[in-house]
């Protein structure tokens, strides 16, 4: 399955590949043939990047799940920071069930998403009102990622694990954890959106 909104990108890449392939044959040009192979490789990369595999999500109000694929690069108090590498799936999912109370988009720079200065980067924040209080899911663009996509709207009722948006080409997602939960992931741990449990309800 391909991510929602990927069609224009893939159509353009496929069209360019086909165009250079036809031109290289028509003009018998080895140079254009090489360009066609490069375009084909880029198209393959785009398909790999925009993949969005189906995942069976076990919905529960006793734990929170990761909103993104990637690696936990920092835990700051009640906030977990997850860095998504280029090879990761870049579709983001709701860590908890609730209602989207607010969505705030801010323009900004494009510093590496793992840097502290990336707090000034382009970002999109979801405030999900859950039974345990508000949960913030912050999408942060990186040096390559320059387009944040939102699949959800204010007042949408969302289920844990539901797709809420994506960031193109490498980025970071921060999620806040309510005080009713205990954070169980550690810095350096790899996580999967909709699958990895990142916090459990306190007993």
Swiss-Prot record:
Its main location: membrane. It comes from the Archaea. Binds 1 pyruvoyl group covalently per subunit. The record marks 170-171 as: Cleavage (non-hydrolytic). It is a peripheral membrane protein. It is an enzyme of class 4 (lyase). It catalyses: archaetidylserine + H(+) = archaetidylethanolamine + CO2. Keywords: Cell membrane, Decarboxylase, Lipid biosynthesis, Lipid metabolism, Lyase, Membrane, Phospholipid biosynthesis, Phospholipid metabolism, Pyruvate, Zymogen. InterPro entries: PS_Dcarbxylase, PSD-A. The keyword DNA damage does not apply. Its EC number is 4.1.1.-. The active site is at residue 171. Is synthesized initially as an inactive proenzyme. Formation of the active enzyme involves a self-maturation process in which the active site pyruvoyl group is generated from an internal serine residue via an autocatalytic post-translational modification. Two non-identical subunits are generated from the proenzyme in this reaction, and the pyruvate is formed at the N-terminus of the alpha chain, which is derived from the carboxyl end of the proenzyme. GO terms for cellular component: plasma membrane. It is found in: Cell membrane. GO terms for molecular function: phosphatidylserine decarboxylase activity. The modification Pyruvic acid (Ser) is found at residue 171. Catalyzes the formation of archaetidylethanolamine (PtdEtn) from archaetidylserine (PtdSer). Heterodimer of a large membrane-associated beta subunit and a small pyruvoyl-containing alpha subunit. Belongs to the phosphatidylserine decarboxylase family. PSD-A subfamily. This is Putative archaetidylserine decarboxylase proenzyme. It comes from Methanosarcina barkeri (strain Fusaro / DSM 804). The lineage of its organism: Archaea, Methanobacteriati, Methanobacteriota, Stenosarchaea group, Methanomicrobia. The gene is asd.
